[in-house]
Amino acid sequence: MRKIFLLSFDDGTIYDKGLVELLNKHQIPGTFNLNSGLEDFVWEFEGREVLRQCISDTVEQYRGHEIASHSLHHHLLTCLDDDTLRWEVGEDCANLRRIFGVEELGFAVPFTACGDREVSILAPLVRYIRLSEFREDFALPADPFHIPIHGLYNDPDIYNRIYDFSRSTLPVALFVMAGHSYELEMLNHWDYMDKLLGYIRSFHFECMTTMEFVNGFYPKR
């Protein structure tokens, strides 16, 4: 039985650097979903400013990990018309290809809303779509454009969820853990994350990037 474990972190803030260091320590690859049009955007979380990074300066930082699109400006996709939706993701992918020298990119949905219209428009532009929808079971999605989330790193029951995953009897089981690196800083979760990654590693799951998973289980047509 194979158990595939993916880590998917959104927004591309300066705190990704610390998360990459933790992932490297535990030899776990991650997928980092970036917005190339928001480098100067600052917002507050828990009363502190969250700082984004200059993406063009992060090529070495993310080496050994995957970068994916999170749209250009992190808009709610269901509020965009068809052409704007294509541009938001297509332009972001073009920027990331130029900066990182990659050919294929996946996409992680900003916020939570992404319906059939959005999937049908975006599927020709990207290799896969990671949704923001939660799924209880660990079965593989029917296609690479409906990849769910199985837990956030700071969910109260995340340890139990991971343990349940380790006991799955499916021939191939999938667990996608998501989050934001700025939460590690603002909530002082660095030590917590270090221990959680060690717990994940103790099960000897097949930890891989989202693109590695998609290419391995969903051949191109």
Language-model features and meaning:
Residues 82-87, 156, 187-190, 194:
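Non-membrane alpha-helical structural segments and their capping/turn regions in soluble enzymes
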Residues 26-117, 124, 135, 140-146, ...:
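Metal-dependent polysaccharide deacetylase catalytic core of the NodB/CE4 family, i.e.
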Residues 2, 25-27, 31, 97-98, ...:
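C-terminal domain-boundary segment and adjacent tail
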Residues 1-15:
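Boundary/entry segment of secreted carbohydrate-active catalytic domains
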Residues 8, 69, 130, 134, ...:
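Glycan-processing catalytic domains of CAZymes
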Residues 11-14, 110-114, 153-154:
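Short beta->alpha connector loops
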Residues 18-22, 117-121, 161, 192-196:
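A short acidic, amphipathic alpha-helical/loop segment
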